[in-house]
Amino acid sequence: MGLALCGAAAQAQEKPNFLIIQCDHLTQRVVGAYGQTQGCTLPIDEVASRGVIFSNAYVGCPLSQPSRAALWSGMMPHQTNVRSNSSEPVNTRLPENVPTLGSLFSESGYEAVHFGKTHDMGSLRGFKHKEPVAKPFTDPEFPVNNDSFLDVGTCEDAVAYLSNPPKEPFICIADFQNPHNICGFIGENAGVHTDRPISGPLPELPDNFDVEDWSNIPTPVQYICCSHRRMTQAAHWNEENYRHYIAAFQHYTKMVSKQVDSVLKALYSTPAGRNTIVVIMADHGDGMASHRMVTKHISFYDEMTNVPFIFAGPGIKQQKKPVDHLLTQPTLDLLPTLCDLAGIAVPAEKAGISLAPTLRGEKQKKSHPYVVSEWHSEYEYVTTPGRMVRGPRYKYTHYLEGNGEELYDMKKDPGERKNLAKDPKYSKILAEHRALLDDYITRSKDDYRSLKVDADPRCRNHTPGYPSHEGPGAREILKRK
């Protein structure tokens, strides 16, 4: 769908404008506002310093298409029936009668525009989308691919729009690919290899790089190296390879941060910027070498599920420190929060919670007792459904394959290194979190218990653990269904 850009000068307006900046793969673990010191996200950190950042923000699925389809519709993946990255008919497009963020705003007098990555299965309905034009370039140190080329076009389109905004209130999404280019970096450095030299020191490995006991984590997580092509390619990396991976991730993050800076400067170059609420977020995170993981796949560790969620602008009361006493779910909460701030009624069927009271500095009377993330499959080569329940202190995960479970004390063990699910001392807490999962399944009409596992035995035939990986991965040995 084409986008006719408005050329009228912005005027003062009662309703706030909204600029949503989303960066694919952006984990909290690289954002300065969340305590990181690499200096990768200075423009994002500046926005955060003026507003509110939520620490415990968890996505509905640590995979692009299910997460995005859920985000823009305010529904969970089992409700949208977009459960993987596959196209139709494996996944179905969101029905036309389902209210979306774009439809609610466009029907309320807003100009709703979207630039950049979609991967939405119809959930961006209501937004006018402009497809970015890829602008190739070269990089002296790190491989760049179409992800980075498309971001150049996305940035140019968003800057052009925000430099000359419409008269009516607008909601604009600048949807960047990076740091997703990290996936291409893995492909360029697959298997045992010698890394290209880079300028500057290599980053250190995270404290939770090593897995202490492969036998004490669920089967699907033990064998991600068989299920996910990028994990197959990285299975036999040495520690220096992983450090180069982190350096590359930081590099792609700095690239997109510069583009975020350009978009923000365009926004604030006109009077409309003073009346615009900025939201910065991500569809999911990245392993960042934690648990020897790269990119994201069958796991719910915080590096993959805990994302930046930042608000700043008119009516948003600056917080001196991150909001860490609330569990938030951008997947469900973004839609009602923005509708509340814009004075738009939220459909009764939407399960999210408006965070507007917290953003205004008021008491948050309604909050989540727990939040959930879901997993089904990436491209149906291996299907291993799972669920995560994150409570105020503990994180519980369950996988249908092997009835696998994890329980982590997120206060004592934020790196999720010691699985307590089999520890008798935690049997009561485990039972409580099993009950929370049952509550979610019942309340949200989740079909989780009826789903089927499909994992070829050839993807489970070596000693558990990525360094022990043997043979090709599922993508190479199985035909797509």
From Swiss-Prot:
Classification via Pfam families: Sulfatase (PF00884)
Transcription regulation keyword on record: no
EC numbers on record: 3.1.6.-
Record keywords: Hydrolase, Metal-binding, Zinc
Keyword match Cytoplasm: no
Positions that bind Zn(2+): C225, C226, H462, H469
Gene Ontology MF term list: arylsulfatase activity; glucuronate-2-sulfatase activity; metal ion binding
SUPFAM superfamilies given in the database record: Alkaline phosphatase-like
Modified residues (3-oxoalanine (Ser)): S64
The protein's required cofactors: Zn(2+)
Region (Disordered): 453-481
Modifications made to the protein after synthesis: The conversion to 3-oxoalanine (also known as C-formylglycine, FGly), of a serine or cysteine residue in prokaryotes and of a cysteine residue in eukaryotes, is critical for catalytic activity.
Biased composition (Basic and acidic residues): 472-481
Family: Belongs to the sulfatase family.
Record's function text: Exosulfatase involved in the degradation of the glycosaminoglycans (GAGs) chondroitin sulfate (CS), dermatan sulfate (DS) and heparan sulfate (HS). 2-O-sulfatase active on unsaturated non-reducing end hexuronate units. Has a slight preference for HS-derived structures. GAG-specific sulfatases play a key role in the persistence of the major human gut symbiont B.thetaiotaomicron in the host gastrointestinal tract.
Protein name: Delta 4,5-hexuronate-2-O-sulfatase
Species this protein is from: Bacteroides thetaiotaomicron (strain ATCC 29148 / DSM 2079 / JCM 5827 / CCUG 10774 / NCTC 10582 / VPI-5482 / E50)
